């Protein structure tokens, strides 16, 4: 799969998930090419405003309905509106994410391991494997 350029990034490093939302994001591994982050969001919890500079694959350990809001508080995604939830053991793709919060609006935790690709962006923006 050929590498593609990342989109221009204009947000400060202070909004990076590890810096801005450390209660829900934990670094597991980092190199020049990849960064692996564990994300945990408990039921009823909302993350701090943060970004994800690099696209990557998310390995789902547990998933729940969520609401993602932009920096102005506007709803960007509400999975309760019919979007299918990823099942444990599946892998989903996530593109770069500008400043946002994520609220777990369900009764089970969100727990994913993200593999952020620092120097390339796969062509497909949405794919599932199980």
Locate predicted features:
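Short, conserved beta-strand element in jelly-roll/cupin
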Residues: 51-72
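A short, N-terminal "cap"/entry segment at the start of jelly-roll beta-barrel domains
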Residues: 1-39, 43-49, 76-99, 103, ...
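A ubiquitous, low-specificity "background" feature that marks scattered single residues
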Residues: 56-58, 71, 110, 122, ...
């Amino acid at each position: 799969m050929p590498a593609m350029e990342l989109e221009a990034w204009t947000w400060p490093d202070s909004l990076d998930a590890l810096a801005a939302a450390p209660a829900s994001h934990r670094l597991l591994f980092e190199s020049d090419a990849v960064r692996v982050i564990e994300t945990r969001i408990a039921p009823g919890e909302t993350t701090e405003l943060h970004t994800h500079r690099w696209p990557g694959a998310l390995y789902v350990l547990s998933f729940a309905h969520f609401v993602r809001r932009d920096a102005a508080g506007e709803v960007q995604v509400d999975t309760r509106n019919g979007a299918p939830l990823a099942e444990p053991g599946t892998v989903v793709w996530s593109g770069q994410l500008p400043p946002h919060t994520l609220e777990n609006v369900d009764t089970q935790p969100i727990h994913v391991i993200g593999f952020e690709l620092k120097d390339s962006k796969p062509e497909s923006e949405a794919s599932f494997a199980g």
